[in-house]
Amino acid sequence: MKFIDEALIRIEAGDGGNGCVSFRREKFIPKGGPDGGDGGDGGDVYLIADENLNTLIDYRFEKRFAAERGENGRSSDCTGRRGKDITLRVPVGTRAIDNDTKEVLGDLTKHGTKMLVAKGGYHGLGNARFKSSVNRAPRQKTNGTPGEKRDLQLELMLLADVGMLGLPNAGKSTFIRAVSAAKPKVADYPFTTLVPSLGVTRVDTSRSFVIADIPGLIEGASEGAGLGVRFLKHLERCHVLIHLVDIAPIDESDPADNIAIIEGELFQYSEKLANKPRWLVFNKIDTLSDEEATARAKNIMQRLGGEDDYYLISAATGKNVDVLCRDIMDFIEENPRQEQEKIDAQEVKFKWDDYHQEQLSEQVFTEDDQEGDDWDDWSEDDEEGVEIIYKP
């Protein structure tokens, strides 16, 4: 299945149903008072995280989703039916962004998490709501309010504990094949990896972590060169980044310069991502003797002004790979993922109960209204269905 990690869709919540103007007219009760019902609320639009999905391909062609409108009110004090909600299923790790305001509406990072992205309109009021001691036959009603409509940008960010960085052909796909059951394509030409892939590394029977492999970066990636930095967003939720470096590049390029290129592109993309814990791992030491590999790594670190804090591995032969994986597992356990801070709900400025009260209080009565035929013909007793006539 094609990997799609971005989608732009149009969502429309349902409008609220209108109120009804109606009067009770039955045998022996010719003027029984107002009985217009309220409309129904419009349907909402939700997103729900589904662990069985791993791509946004479902939203590549179908891009418009609309909830049902609320029904209008009817006579006999019948309230209109509420519009049906719609729920869109997305992969775990999806972020919802308002495309117009660029506001992040939320992240769906757990299976079954449900998020409201468009609120349906509220119902209008029927004329029965407006009856009072001075207005016994009201002809006022209110219409339902429009539902929210927005263009929604969906971005899928893979949930992994470890992310891998490096130039093309640094051995990232070979490494993930060596430590997990994932089988990304491996070849001796650049950009063999075209889409991100995930693998589960099991250190022992009870401990494991998820590792993400993304396409390699090249110089100028932040400006769109190569595959660009489009896939770097998949590393934003990782505990630690593994910077894989070919210690003996076949093109005879300088590994120190290659490290500097990746570091520079990372900082240009995101300072937050650049400040994540990052481990330097020299790969392909099987092409050199142990002494030569150690000497070359020390020379590179001295030129970069860094400490002797690095790993020497061979993903192809598996040399020192187990040690690296166990150290990664220990680091993850010592630094658990921080839960997102819960934001206290803020009091909304617009309250529908207040809105309805305002609609009722803003009604204006004129002398023409009071001189109408129905103004003084209805009494409280009519609501019981029997007209009471008092003997003089």
UniProtKB/Swiss-Prot annotation:
Gene3D superfamilies: GTP1/OBG domain, P-loop containing nucleotide triphosphate hydrolases. The keyword Nucleotide-binding applies. Residues 365-386 have a biased composition (Acidic residues). One of its GO terms (molecular function) is GTP binding. It is an enzyme of class 3 (hydrolase). It is found in: Cytoplasm. Pfam families: GTP1_OBG (PF01018), MMR_HSR1 (PF01926). GTP binds at residues 166-173, 191-195, 213-216, 283-286, 314-316. Residues 362-392 are annotated as: Disordered. Mg(2+) binds at residues 173, 193. The keyword GTP-binding applies. Its EC number is 3.6.5.-. Keywords: Cytoplasm, GTP-binding, Hydrolase, Magnesium, Metal-binding, Nucleotide-binding. One of its GO terms (biological process) is ribosome biogenesis. One of its GO terms (cellular component) is cytoplasm. Monomer. NCBIfam families: Obg_CgtA (TIGR02729), PRK12297.1 (NF008955), PRK12299.1 (NF008956). PANTHER family: DEVELOPMENTALLY REGULATED GTP-BINDING PROTEIN-RELATED, MITOCHONDRIAL RIBOSOME-ASSOCIATED GTPASE 2. Belongs to the TRAFAC class OBG-HflX-like GTPase superfamily. OBG GTPase family. This is GTPase Obg.
